[in-house]
Structures are given as structure tokens and as C-alpha cells.
Amino acid sequence: MTFYQELQLSSAGSKQLIKNTQDSKEKRRHILIYNFKVYLVMIFCVAIVTVFSKLLGNNNSVVGVTVLLAVLVLRQADFGIKTSHGLISIMGIYAILIAGPRVSNMVPPVAAFVINVVCIMLLMIMGCHNVIMYNHSTFVLGYLLLQGYDVTGHEYIMRVVGLLAGMLVCMIIFYKNQRNRPYRRTFWDLFKEFNINSARTRWYIKLTFIVSSAMLIVSLMGLPRAMWIGIACMSVCLPFSKDVDKRIGNRALFNVVGCAIFAVMYIVLPESMYPYIGMIGGIGVGYSAGYAWQTAFNTFGALSIAAGLFGMPYAVALRIGLNAAGAAYTWLCDKVLERIHSAVQAKNVSVAE
């Protein structure tokens, strides 16, 4: 395997390669490349987000995160349709990312719920037809981040400029990497194939309802950071119900682990080191091969910002509470919605007979 090929491996792939290598010299080489890759990706991510922050303003650093996530995914993922029509999907997705989060922050919670339902459903239809790609973890996450870190006035204009630039970059990279895909399905087929009886469509509806309603409940309660519960719900609401239970347990447990580690670091480290805690979390994510520890280290960046706004104890308590509530709420809704679907199916069968 070449140096470049090893750089393309996931953390799990690199760890498996190191584990399976018997020759000590080759093993050291693989370990060195793996470490190099982790820090290279970290430096690249920090550089991209820094550039966006410098050009668009510090409050728009989230645009850099959103675009970066999309670029990393669109290098390899597709939409299950013709590549030229995939470009239309990208334009539609970015149109929602530009308008949806801003408008939802301008209206009362119930109206915001309706806007979220429409926007998230469209993101699912346009970006998540190829279920195994897990594209929702990129596009819906981007929507929630932009909504949670809202801006107005000139900063919003700069946000629009940044997202439009990101859209063009994504379109170029997507077309370059995916132009030889053999799909015959068109953009409009994504909407034509919306069928309440299909597992894919039921997942669309389930995720959209769970995420939007969870954020509505938090907003009506007057709690900050409603996006945290939305992200938690999105993260554990998987296409297949049998996968949900394990993901929920990992989300709840390792979110607490991450918060505990963050709290210790926040107390032990000098205040001058606080801005680097998020970066430490990013390195931890790079070394994490599984969802559990990725969840733990992902808490660092979010808490670094929230601790400065609300104080560390409240930020940690809020993070733990919203994530636990989101996981439990998703589990409950998943079971109820699946039971309703089974009952409807059984009734239809009995009527047909």
C-alpha cells in the first residue's frame, strides 16, 4: 500500500492495518503515517476554518465548518442520481442552508418548527437518497450549526457570500470525483420516489419529526442551545431501528465521559489554554475509530464556546441534559412510530384479505 493510499484510510482502517502488520519495521511505518495523517487533517481543518473566520468574521467560523464537512463528504459520496443532477441537489441544499436557519430564528418557536420540518425534509430528500452514505450527518448537521450560531445584518451577508463560495467549491469537487457514476435516476426522481411505504421515506419522516419537535420542546422551555438536542437526535436516529439502541447508549454515556474530561481540563489548565481545548478534541476525534469516543471528543469544541457564555458548570450540565434527553426522546419516538407503522400494515393486510 502506497503512502497516499494509507492517507485515504479511515481511523478504523489504519488501526486495523497496524494491528495486522507482523513486520516491526512496516508496523512503525504505518504508525508514523497514521499519526501524520491525524495531524495533517487537523492542520487542514484549522486552516480552512481560520481562513473563513478571517474573511467572513469570527462569528461566521461555522460556515468554514459546514463547507469543510460537505467537501470531505462529497469527495467520495454521491446522491444516487446523475452527476449533473447531483449539482442541482447541491444548489438546493445550499439554498436551504442560506435561508432556512436565518428565517427560523426570526419567528416564534412553533413557526420555527414548521420551517425546520420543511427544510430538514428537503435536505433529506435531496441529499440522503443513498442511505448508506449517511449524508444526513453532514447536511442536517450543517443546518443545525448555522441555526445555532445565527448572525444578522452585515455578518449574515458575509455568511451568504461564504456559503455561495462553498457551494461552488463543493460542485467542482463533486463533479470532478463523481462524473463517471453510471446512475440514470434524475433529480426529480428523488421526489417521485417519496413513498410512505418505503423504509427510506419513513426514515426521512422520522428523523425530520424527531429533530424538529425536540428543538421545539427545548425552545418552548426557554433553554439555550436547542441545536444540541437536535444534533443528538439526528446522530442516533439511524435508517434502521435495530441500530438505534446501541447508538443511543453510546451517545448518552460517552457524552458524559467527554463532559467530565472537559471539566477536568477546564479546571486544571490555565485560562490561556482554553481556546485550544477544542483543538485537542479535534485531535482526539482523529484518533477515534468508533462513534463512542468521537462523541466524547466532539463535546470539547461545543463546550469551549458555551463555557465562555454560560460558565463551565451550567454548560456541562446543559450539554449532558440535552444529549441524554435527545437520546431518550429519539428512542421513544422510534419505538412509537415503528409500532404505529406495524399496526397500520397489519390493518391493511387484514383489509386486503
How does the language model describe each region?
Residues 1-260, 264-297, 305-353:
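Alpha-helical transmembrane segments and their membrane-interface boundaries
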